[in-house]
Amino acid sequence: MASCAVQLIDKVPKKKVEKKKFEPNILKEPCMKHPLQNRWGLWFYKNDKSKMWQDNLRLITKFDTVEDFWGLYNNIQLPSKLSSGCDYSMFKDGIEPMWEDRSNKCGGRWLITLAKQHRHTELDHFWLETLLCLIGEGFSSFSRDICGSVINIRAKGDKIALWTSNAENCETVTYIGRKYKESLGLPQKLVIGYQAHADTATKSNSITKNKFVV
């Protein structure tokens, strides 16, 4: 009987022991984005004389992180590649790139005019530096007075304007102008002017007087 029992035990199929694969416990870090102090909107304007001015202006997108800014910047045309009559505008969320907006109507702009021959040498660089000043709050505590910036591509020459909210605040406006000029690496002997939107809107000719210069 004992030998028979041994034979029966031997005939019982042995269970296969599955070897567990070793999987290291790797913690996947979430993709961390770096928030900006303000949310910004990028606008595009293309001149179509058959439409009202406002109908030619459209909001491309809004962003509020460093990564989203670069993702946007690297996937749109550079200003130097735009057709004549086109604009880019970047403004704080809630502000539209027009004089009539309540955040702009009492303000003005620091204006840089570039000759046509500088379009492929300086224009893109100056525009990028301007954007970095905006999103990086590059004007210290005076950044709260910044509304946004506009770049105009025109046949006769291009313009970059930095808009502020209060044209009467001399200390704030002049500080921003000096800091902006420094950030762009402009020579000291080069003078740039600040124009109040109210003066630009009521000018009698093509020239608007400068309220401040640096």
UniProtKB/Swiss-Prot annotation:
GO biological process: regulation of translation; translational initiation
Molecular function in Gene Ontology: RNA binding; translation initiation factor activity
Signal peptide boundaries: none
Regions that span the bilayer: none
Cysteines engaged in disulfide bonds, as pairs: none
Top-rank taxon, per record: Eukaryota
Coiled coil regions, renumbered to chain: none
PROSITE patterns xrefs: IF4E
Chief place where the protein resides: cytoplasm
Tissue expression per record: Ovary, muscle and testis.
Residues that coordinate or bind mRNA: 53-54, 99-100, 154-159, 202-204
Protein name as annotated: Eukaryotic translation initiation factor 4E-1B
